[in-house]
């Protein structure tokens, strides 16, 4: 049975515990595979676990960076005051990254496409955004997007969303990723004048780096 959690923090703590108990050694991580679960209240997206010491200020800056659609890490620095080391390492020689998901969902007007599809037909199965793009493989030498796709459905007049990822680090990645995707879900629901429903999160490889064990 697919697991369900009330909010993001509950999901984080449960998945972290599962990795610690059942994860296998995989490179420089402990990992579990095909990890999928529902978050029933995705708007409850703050990570309150004290050991994690998660920063809403950073997550909010990252969200506005995504909204800008600007893949430059300089834009993130403008919003947050500095560039976190992980983004510095992933930036290409132009100072740009492929994992600015806002840049990806604006590509080919994908976000507008999704909203229009849902407005035209609430029962559509075509309201999907592609993040990973095989046509961009030559750009993925330093930064390969962790997310494949995001799909939306209106169920009982609520906007439900599924996120599919090739890889997700529970400590750094999931805590911020779920915040960004839940914010996207809220934004699309607002455009459609409906409430949000569940958020389903699936990672082929969900892991914790060994330096966090």
PLM ranges: what are they?
Residues 1-213:
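Terminal, non-catalytic protein-protein interaction segments that mediate quaternary/complex assembly
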């Amino acid at each position: 049975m697919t697991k369900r959690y009330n909010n993001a923090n509950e999901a984080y703590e449960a998945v972290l515990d599962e990795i610690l108990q059942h994860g296998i050694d995989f490179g420089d991580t402990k990992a579990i595979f095909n990890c999928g679960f529902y978050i029933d209240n995705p708007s409850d997206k703050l990570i309150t676990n004290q050991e994690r010491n998660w920063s809403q200020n950073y997550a909010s800056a990252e969200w506005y960076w995504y909204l800008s659609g600007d893949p430059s890490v300089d834009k993130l620095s403008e919003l947050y005051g500095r560039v976190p080391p992980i983004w510095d390492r992933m930036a290409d020689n132009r100072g740009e990254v492929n994992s600015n998901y806002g840049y990806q969902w604006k590509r080919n007007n994908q976000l507008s496409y999704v909203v229009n599809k849902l407005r035209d037909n609430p029962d559509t199965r075509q309201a999907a955004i592609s993040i990973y793009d095989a046509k961009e493989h030559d750009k993925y030498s330093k930064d390969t997007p962790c997310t494949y796709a995001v799909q939306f459905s209106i169920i009982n007049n609520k906007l439900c969303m599924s996120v599919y990822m090739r890889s997700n680090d529970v400590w750094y990645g999931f805590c911020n990723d779920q915040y960004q995707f839940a914010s996207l879900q809220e934004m699309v629901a607002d455009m459609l004048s409906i409430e949000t429903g569940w958020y389903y999160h699936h990672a082929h490889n969900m892991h914790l780096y060994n330096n966090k064990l």
